[in-house]
């Protein structure tokens, strides 16, 4: 930081409301810094609070504000650090917060917790923490991101499933191996290399190597991958199918040693949803921020596909268990720190009444998730026989309002 003669004579407070989190435009952060510097050219500045909510269970390769993914949190912190380091009048900064902490009034992905920490409640190291450690630590270091994501799933048309893996290091390039095979050499940008890694079904060992100031650095992680076929011509996976609706998020469930995958549209011979739109709350943010009662797996129920016509899976003949997950969604009350996330008009989607028909048989009649309570997890388990090549065809027939589905699981008996 450049020294300014009058830096500590007069304190100045600047309105920074976590641009890119509570405010939608992340680039407004550096615009405000430059604007303040133009008004106070002889004084240095400190950014005393910034952060984004991160749930270590949630991941997305299409990260967006308020999805609580590790990937959006990393994107946010990389941007802030880069922009502050560009400006010699920024004397320092303070991340909000070192670790997650309890906050009773909050909903979000982890209710009653402020998840802006770069460490979890259990002090697990989120990707943002590893990034700062590699960029600001005294000793040369390299860290592979996604350390918390032990159980993963990915759709593929081959025996391999490619997934981007971040590597953090103060070097120009990184060599990455998977299962002792060279994946490639990847260039870094802002201290992050994104390696496209080919995973196989089962346990995979990923290793990364680089050189920092003449010192060799490396790291390794173990990933348990379930490669889910895009079609079931060769059989249905014994580990089943677990799909969340209305988002591009993955959610790891360590208790069940599995990973929920994001939805995809149905293709002939494969599986997926038919019709509908993604539920977005006022302010165009993903899903709801309400505390979902009756579960600790809130992210599964906080997103939703509305006006869905069907979910189809062209599975082999046999007996299957279909588990449908629903929640009647309504926005949580607007909080003073997050007014921009709520529009003037509240959405009320509690009037959603419909029938569910599976392979021509009505299994739920005049179903309304709101009958069980608003923002409450509702689970319906159905046994069905797929025969004569018909596969599984779950139809949602509207009676009043919109049909909807939050998540679906399919197992073969």
Where are these regions (language model features)?
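Substrate-binding/catalytic cleft of secreted carbohydrate-active enzymes
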Residues: 1-124, 128, 132, 141, ...
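Generic beta-strand/beta-sheet core signal
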Residues: 6-7, 48, 96, 168-170, ...
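Short, glycine-/Ser/Thr-/acidic-enriched flexible segments
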Residues: 9-11, 52-53, 100, 125, ...
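A short acidic/small-residue loop/turn micro-motif
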Residues: 12, 184, 190, 364-366, ...
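Generic recognition of flexible, low-complexity loop/linker segments
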Residues: 33-35, 80-83, 151-154, 162-165, ...
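A structural signal for short secondary-structure junctions
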Residues: 38-40, 87-88, 158-160, 168-170, ...
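Carbohydrate-binding surfaces of carbohydrate-active enzymes
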Residues: 83-239
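Compositionally biased, intrinsically disordered or flexible polar/acidic segments
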Residues: 228-413
